[in-house]
From Swiss-Prot:
The lineage of its organism: Eukaryota, Metazoa, Chordata, Craniata, Vertebrata. It comes from the Eukaryota. The gene is FGF7. Disulfide bonds: none annotated. This is Fibroblast growth factor 7. Residues 1-31 form the signal peptide. Gene3D superfamilies: 2.80.10.50. PROSITE patterns: HBGF_FGF. Pfam families: FGF. Belongs to the heparin-binding growth factors family. Plays an important role in the regulation of embryonic development, cell proliferation and cell differentiation. Required for normal branching morphogenesis. Growth factor active on keratinocytes. Possible major paracrine effector of normal epithelial cell proliferation. Keywords: Glycoprotein, Growth factor, Heparin-binding, Mitogen, Signal.
Amino acid sequence: MRKWILTWILPSLLYRSCFHIICLVGTISLACNDMTPEQMATNVNCSSPERHTRSYDYMEGGDIRVRRLFCRTQWYLRIDKRGKVKGTQEMKNNYNIMEIRTVAVGIVAIKGVESEYYLAMNKEGKLYAKKECNEDCNFKELILENHYNTYASAKWTHSGGEMFVALNSKGVPVRGKKTKKEQKTAHFLPMAIT
């Protein structure tokens, strides 16, 4: 009878120990996912290929993508031949075709292909266009969980907060001072040219 009891206790103990090991490993992986990139770089145990799946090649420098930037407010970003920045709902408009050039990791410059003007933002958060690219033309490109991108000025901030490229529901550019990353006016889909 005792032998019978021991054979049932042994698998139970094995299952419990396996369960505790699984919980421990799960806790460690959760702790690693909450780390900043700097902490992850120093912690070898948490570094894994799965953690870096959102590392896109074009963010590492030198790449050029030709896209239409479609805002969640249903407008395409447009830079016309006079350098005016606004939205258009015409998909086949050549002035809404943009060249997105990677300047540094996560930093891009956006240029209208037809107009040959660069998108820029001044310290007041106003969007404008320039023929020559400078620091006002650099934007931090961030890919959100909802698959939209945001473009924040790499040079200018307002009260410590980032200023984003944004189009309101009428296609008018919103001043960067009035924008936040969570607002749909600042969310853009880079659409491939067909």
